Amino acid sequence: MIKVTEKRADEEGHRKIKSRMVADGSKQRSYEGYEKSDGSSPTARTDSIIMTGVVDAHERRHIAIIDVENAFLQSENDQRIRMAIPGKTTELLVRLNPALYRPYIWYTKKGVPMLYVLIEKALYGMLRAALLFYRKLRADLEDMGFEVNPYDPCVANKVIKGNQCTICWHVDDLKISHVDSKVVLCSTTQQWSTLHLIT
């Protein structure tokens, strides 16, 4: 959500625009000692993508590329995070369910309705959303018997039907490869749907 407000012109006549952003990746942590790595997700290394592509070609593997739909919303938020919902969106929520939302609405000095909510799921744009999804995806893959590569935490392998299946990922985009197309198709339909990773 982005709220844009035009400010008055300065002494030289230049207009200034101010924006406040929620869940857009802007500074959500500004306290001393916070490191960017505390909230960032690992992603597949470029050389891993190239090397797995070389192996795929050499072994004549079948490949599937999938995008995990609603990936972040599948991940539980592990911190207490509040989000302010201003103005029109707040009004729409009250219209949707007055009994639920109206008691929690408050107004700014300028009369703008506001609603604070607790975020239970990882929300697109939240600083830690990609990291939370990474942890979930990695745990799900390990539960399926995949071993994560010790040199790249976004590459995982498992021997299926006597041949290696490789999954390489960048956030919610996965490349799955195996010599048997049925294994790749099984990975993208049955197993992924079972884990609710795709809908």
Q: Where do the language-model regions lie?
A:
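Long, low-complexity, charge-biased intrinsically disordered regions
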Residues: 1-199
